């Protein structure tokens, strides 16, 4: 792991020549460089070398939001988690920002006000790529407040602010994942009205809370997972949301017994000498 940079304020950051990339640009650039080295892009994922992984590489290079569609145990979530390895090691954020504001391009009122007050003396901190992964399991009880946020009426009253003012919002998981990868597992389980709330974020990069529209250009890489069996058992993905997901990647079970045995060997935790894994010797 690269050492954490020692730059502590905006002046030093500007002097270093640092330039900002969006999350999708980061992933695309780093994947392109990795492919050129000839190293495996997603190591220890067996059976997908000529199917899923090339599709995933194309989706990342195309800067698409991604949906993994497949049955249980097909490494959908594992692949999603491995994508963080393609992020830059460290990125700067404005110290104290709830939504990981970029010091060179803040999007929240907090970030803009801090820079207006402190200028080049604005304090920054560094965020490691391992902290840039957010994951939410879609369940029927998930609400818009959980994902996007809600108006805090107490804060609005105490500060005498309009409900349309960004400062009265309690941000949900998605805004807090700004400049990160956000994974929603089992997307069909998410209620249709909750899926609808994602439209403007995916397309216009706006968030809408209780009818108030705020132009906050969030920078996110969305990854979804879905099981086709869930379409009949519990729910479905609404069509307009499908249209906003750039790439749908179909996963599958191993095509050969040798690959299946290799995966079983990798996933088994056989430590005691008296345990015999007969499948490997079939």
Question: Positions of the model-derived regions?
Answer:
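Conserved ASCE/P-loop NTPase catalytic core
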Residues: 2-256
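A short, hydrophobic/aromatic-rich structural module that often spans a beta strand
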Residues: 201, 273-277
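Conserved small/polar residues in nucleotide/adenosyl-binding loops
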Residues: 280-282
